[in-house]
């Protein structure tokens, strides 16, 4: 019985699996037969190649037919120029949305090396319009999609402008257009009114979205392409501009005639109901894209248009060339008014006929001139925070003469002196957002058994967040202001928790607003003394600070003290999600969440709002620069005030060294004439010259001692003296030195 000889190895050759063939098939010891799966793949590839060849042949036939039709209808002159034609021809290799690539369905191992693929740009290129300092991971993907859509819209508008510019440059060569232009490229210049809002169901969905959004932006833009043709410019135009307008209108008429004569090359939809459904779906998608873009732009404008620290500086108005407004030489009126109000409140005292003076002692420890600061608050509300009735007074210290705020805790009996030592740590806490604790003492000056007193810094004109935002209705707080409050409180809590302490007074009634959105936490250290005997777990108390922090933000965002109750909590959070950014919503939810393990801490909050902290730092630096500018103005005014004071000491002095005419002789006479030159000049009609700029300019030149010379005239107009500012400065210094030397000898 004969047996067929078997090959040495039945394994398939790797070259067959990888490349489909083997060069050494006659010498190779492995099998070269294809598996059933490979045979199916080979058949599929052959079928795909045949289909592609058929499609290419059909496309070539269609292109030849179109060229024949266009050549028969067009001019021969249009076929001669090819290199300078700005309009793309159908045979061009440039990709077009209506030109289908012949290798779309080809799948090979080298497909990733194709040059037709989109390049992967750097991730920072998608955020050229700016992003918030902190973006949650849930929002990152949505924001990237919005940025990509905006870039596509900008590219579409730029392409249209470039094509229109190229056409205008070569209009003398092609006055009637090029008959070989595709319908798509002609619609780029003049879109025709089409049904279903201009949406073509045969085009790509993403391409239709981009075209529709670009059209909406053109219609909304005041300098769009359509308005350049249709709307006349009200401003006066030159003759060249008018000629350009007429040429553009002629181009528009030519394109309309060509599009009316040329039949549309787009195939009609076979199923009208399917076409309508697709159009409705596309319209909904487009509306959603537009709404998202508009919402993002509005939110960005709101965040960037308002700063929590408005500037004091005023815009400089120049009345004449080289002249400034008088207000630019002095402090801002608003800043001046704020300082005056604070100064007036520092020295308030009770009227002797005021009935409250009977219940206030004239002296309290080392403080006098007590003035009640919470006389308008009810007695019930004064004790709801600490469990005891409290009252606040302004008092003057006998040691340094400075005002302080003293909070009295009524009805509290101190059980141990260690309770006072527990609050001594607060005296070492110095933070710009914390009202510093200065002293704690016990006194019976109010006539009761004993009361506990806490001495704090005094900030005149301050008010609580409760009285500012919760006692009266108004518009919602700007998100910039909320983030400023959040950053300030976070900074204060970071300092408190790092020192091993707990705040526990994060409440609208205990946070003071002391300036332009500058807040300070008041009443620190009271709970450490009042609840000294209560067992403490530091981590839990610090987490309670974060819970109170979240409730405070939610209360201010809703401007309602009832927003954090059990019945209104879910509605309040929903309101924040609709009114403010996702970042603020996530922070509030994080602070109000109480997990079983791994309690949140202030360090995690700092990481969450790190971007906002940088923004707050920028605001503060800008505000500091503004205050330094105002301070520099007052420094200049102080320098000039010293000069005017010296002139006042010297001029018109009735008697000096037993000489009644001392101020009228010698160098003092020049000083008198210079005083008249500054303040007593008159116009030709006899009216006085009231020029502040002249006074400031003259005094500055005098202080510098410049060599510029001026003409001084006596009052009887009989004497004229030419003198420089440098000489006048020497005269003033010499005369003032005489006065000083005589005083030292006495």
UniProtKB/Swiss-Prot annotation:
InterPro entries found in the cross-reference section: Kinase-like_dom_sf, PAN3, Pan3_PK, Prot_kinase_dom, Znf_CCCH
Binding site for ATP: 407, 457-464, 509-510
CC per GO annotation: P-body; PAN complex
Biased composition range(s): Low complexity: 64-97, 221-275
Zinc finger (C3H1-type): 7-35
GO MF annotations, alphabetized: ATP binding; poly(A) binding; protein kinase activity; zinc ion binding
Sequence ranges of Polar residues compositional bias: 196-205
Keyword Thylakoid in annotation: no
Region entry Disordered, spans: 64-100, 169-205, 219-275
Region (Pseudokinase domain): 351-610
Coiled-coil residue spans: 611-649
Knob domain: annotated span: 650-746
Pfam families given in the database record: Pan3_PK, Pkinase
GO biological process, alphabetically ordered: mRNA processing; nuclear-transcribed mRNA poly(A) tail shortening
Localization in the cell: Cytoplasm
Main localisation: cytoplasm
Function: Regulatory subunit of the poly(A)-nuclease (PAN) deadenylation complex, one of two cytoplasmic mRNA deadenylases involved in mRNA turnover. PAN specifically shortens poly(A) tails of RNA and the activity is stimulated by poly(A)-binding protein (PABP). PAN deadenylation is followed by rapid degradation of the shortened mRNA tails by the CCR4-NOT complex. Deadenylated mRNAs are then degraded by two alternative mechanisms, namely exosome-mediated 3'-5' exonucleolytic degradation, or deadenylation-dependent mRNA decaping and subsequent 5'-3' exonucleolytic degradation by XRN1.
Assembly and oligomerization: Homodimer. Forms a heterotrimer with a catalytic subunit PAN2 to form the poly(A)-nuclease (PAN) deadenylation complex. Interacts (via PAM-2 motif) with poly(A)-binding protein (via PABC domain), conferring substrate specificity of the enzyme complex.
Domain notes: The N-terminal zinc finger binds to poly(A) RNA. The pseudokinase domain, the coiled-coil (CC), and C-terminal knob domain (CK) form a structural unit (PKC) that forms an extensive high-affinity interaction surface for pan2.
Family: Belongs to the protein kinase superfamily. PAN3 family.
Protein name: PAN2-PAN3 deadenylation complex subunit pan3
Organism: Dictyostelium discoideum
Gene name of the encoded protein: pan3
């Amino acid at each position: 019985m004969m047996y067929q000889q078997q090959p040495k190895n039945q394994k398939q050759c790797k070259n067959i699996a990888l490349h489909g063939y083997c060069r050494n098939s006659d010498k190779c010891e492995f099998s070269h037969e294809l598996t059933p799966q490979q045979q199916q793949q080979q058949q599929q590839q052959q079928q795909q190649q045949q289909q592609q060849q058929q499609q290419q042949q059909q496309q070539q036939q269609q292109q030849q037919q179109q060229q024949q039709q266009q050549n028969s209808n067009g001019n021969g002159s249009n076929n001669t120029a090819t290199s300078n034609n700005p309009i793309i021809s159908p045979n061009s290799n440039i990709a077009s949305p209506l030109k289908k690539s012949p290798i779309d369905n080809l799948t090979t191992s080298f497909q990733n090396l194709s040059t037709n693929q989109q390049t992967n740009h750097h991730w920072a290129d998608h955020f050229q319009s700016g992003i918030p300092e902190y973006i949650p991971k849930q929002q990152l993907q949505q924001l990237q999609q919005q940025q990509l859509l905006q870039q596509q819209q900008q590219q579409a508008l730029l392409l249209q402008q470039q094509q229109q510019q190229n056409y205008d440059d070569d209009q003398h060569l092609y006055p009637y257009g090029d008959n070989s232009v595709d319908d798509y490229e002609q619609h780029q210049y003049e879109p025709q009114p089409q049904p279903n809002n201009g949406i073509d169901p045969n085009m790509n969905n993403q391409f239709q979205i981009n075209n529709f959004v670009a059209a909406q932006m053109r219609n909304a833009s005041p300098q769009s392409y359509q308005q350049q043709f249709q709307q006349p410019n009200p401003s006066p135009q030159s003759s060249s501009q008018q000629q350009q307008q007429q040429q553009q209108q002629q181009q528009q008429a030519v394109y309309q005639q060509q599009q009316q004569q040329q039949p549309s090359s787009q195939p009609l939809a076979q199923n009208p109901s399917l076409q309508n459904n697709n159009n409705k779906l596309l319209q909904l998608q487009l509306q959603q894209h537009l709404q998202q873009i508009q919402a993002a732009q509005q939110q960005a404008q709101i965040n960037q248009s308002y700063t929590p620290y408005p500037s004091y500086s005023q815009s400089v108005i120049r009345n004449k060339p080289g002249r400034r407004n008088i207000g630019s030489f002095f402090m801002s009126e608003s800043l001046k008014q704020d300082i005056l109000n604070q100064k007036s409140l520092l020295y308030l005292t009770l009227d002797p006929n005021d009935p409250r003076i009977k219940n206030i002692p004239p002296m309290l420890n080392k403080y006098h001139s007590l003035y009640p600061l919470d006389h308008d608050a009810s007695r019930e509300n004064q004790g709801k925070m600490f469990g005891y009735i409290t009252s606040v007074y302004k008092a003057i210290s006998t040691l340094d003469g400075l005002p302080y705020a003293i909070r009295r805790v009524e009805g509290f009996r101190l059980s141990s002196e260690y309770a006072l030592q527990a609050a001594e740590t607060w005296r070492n806490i110095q933070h710009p957002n914390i009202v510093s604790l200065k002293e704690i003492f016990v006194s019976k000056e109010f006539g009761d058994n004993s009361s506990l007193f806490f001495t704090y810094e005094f900030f005149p004109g301050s008010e609580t967040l409760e009285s500012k935002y919760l006692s009266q209705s108004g518009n919602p707080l700007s998100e910039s202001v909320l983030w400023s409050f959040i950053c300030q409180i976070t900074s204060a809590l970071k300092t408190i928790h790092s020192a091993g302490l707990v705040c526990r007074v994060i409440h609208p009634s205990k946070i003071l607003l002391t300036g332009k959105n500058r807040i300070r936490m008041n009443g620190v250290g009271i709970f450490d003394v009042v609840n000294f005997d209560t067992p403490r777990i530091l981590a839990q108390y610090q987490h309670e600070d974060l819970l109170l922090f979240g409730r405070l933000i939610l209360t201010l965002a809703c401007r309602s003290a009832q927003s954090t109750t059990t019945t209104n909590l879910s509605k309040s959070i929903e309101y924040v999600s609709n009114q403010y950014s996702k970042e603020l919503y996530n922070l509030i939810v994080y602070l109000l969440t109480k997990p079983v393990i791994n309690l949140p801490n202030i360090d995690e909050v700092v990481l969450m709002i790190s971007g906002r902290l940088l923004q707050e730092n920028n605001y503060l630096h800008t505000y500091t620069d503004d205050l330094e500018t105002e301070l520099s103005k007052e420094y200049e005014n102080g320098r000039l005030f010293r000069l005017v004071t010296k002139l006042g000491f010297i001029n018109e002095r009735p008697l000096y060294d037993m000489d009644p005419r001392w101020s009228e002789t010698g160098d003092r006479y020049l000083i008198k004439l210079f005083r008249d030159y500054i303040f007593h000049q008159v116009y030709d009609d006899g009216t006085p010259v009231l020029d502040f700029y002249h006074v400031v300019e003259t005094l500055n030149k005098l202080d510098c001692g410049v060599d510029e010379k001026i003409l001084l005239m006596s009052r009887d107009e009989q004497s004229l003296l030419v003198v420089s500012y440098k000489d006048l400065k020497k005269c003033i210094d010499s005369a003032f030195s005489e006065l000083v030397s005589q005083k030292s000898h006495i």
